[in-house]
Amino acid sequence: MDVHAQTTSPSARRPRRLVTLGGLTLAGALALAACSSTSSSPATTKASSSPSTTGAASATAKILTPPSSTVALTETGSTLLYPLFNLWGPVYSKQYPNITLTTAGTGSGTGISQAAAGAIDIGASDAYLSSSQVSAHPGLLNIPLAISAQMINYNLPGVSGHLKLDPTVIARIYEGKITAWNDAAIAKLNPGVTLPATRIVPLHRIDGSCDTFLFSQYLSKGDPADWGANNFGTSISFPPISSALGATGNGGMVSECAKTVGCIAYIGISFEAQTQKNHLGEAMVANGSGNYVLPDNATIDAEAAGFTKSTPANGAISMIYGKTAAQGYPIINYEYAIVNAKQSSSTTAQAIRAFLSWAINAAGGNAPSFLSQVGFRPLPPSVVSQSQAQLQSVQ
């Protein structure tokens, strides 16, 4: 694929079948802070079809066996992970009818706090634990489950293909320094494209979210001199701009952008089906090598590969705006299970170890039949092994 092409249609670019869950909100506690989010209804899963493992690479870690007794596992947290857990649960329960999984999308911050309190078995988070959280809860683990990405979308009728945007231009937009789509800075990145004089409407999250963390960290790493090297977080004070709008959750970002001509927004990739349904454009964004890329299987994998060797044993690492992958997509992250190493019973501990060992395995939950539905990518084999090693601490 020519990453500089301007005429590829969004629907033709990636043949992925994505889960559409309207109204889900993404919130998280990323390295510096915890977030809150609107709750999604709990779902208890019991039955579905078995996964296809065609084309899945063999994982180095084995899938563990759950206990023979009945165990009801509970999961809550990241609404970006919520669709994936809802795919995983029924299949796992079909294979092991004595194990059930009740899921809820309440935001990563809730997932972390509930796991820390021992109120649930598995917390789902779009981010690793902060140093303060680790200090407060030394037995809490963040276990990588899969890899996700964030899109930059816009509502610009009549403009086909994918506009190119870099972190400097995006930062200027959110600072109110670039106010029209035909601004010279945008035109320079998109020669030959007829840009309208439409007013730009920067859309941002008004709830604390990992999307805001990822987005603002991309700007801080790509434009440190102007945006600010430390101007990132789950909740930041965006510059006051008269045209700017706020929305809650990824679902809110999609719907608000869809009804606002001129909008630009940052949206989690598991909502790609909704962005396409609402005819939102998707930008090719500049990576650390200066190339413009879209988030697809190849570019997400390429970016992740640049961080594989540096991923620590506990999986806590930022993968934003790397400089080693020429065709890597620059806004990606690990998705995490937050689990207490010390469980209330050995039976529960065994069930957690078994389920999560299945979830991270290419012959189980990391199979394309699951991940492709939400736009996620599988863990590299070495990270699978690291996650498996962390699971052994759950007792």
Where are these regions (language model features)?
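Flexible loop/hinge segments at secondary-structure junctions
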Residues: 2-4, 13, 36-38, 44-395
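Bacterial N-terminal signal peptides that target proteins for export
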Residues: 4-25
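Generic alpha-helix initiation/capping and coil-helix boundary signal
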Residues: 20-24, 40, 380
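C-terminal motif of bacterial Sec signal peptides marking the signal peptidase cleavage site
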Residues: 29-34
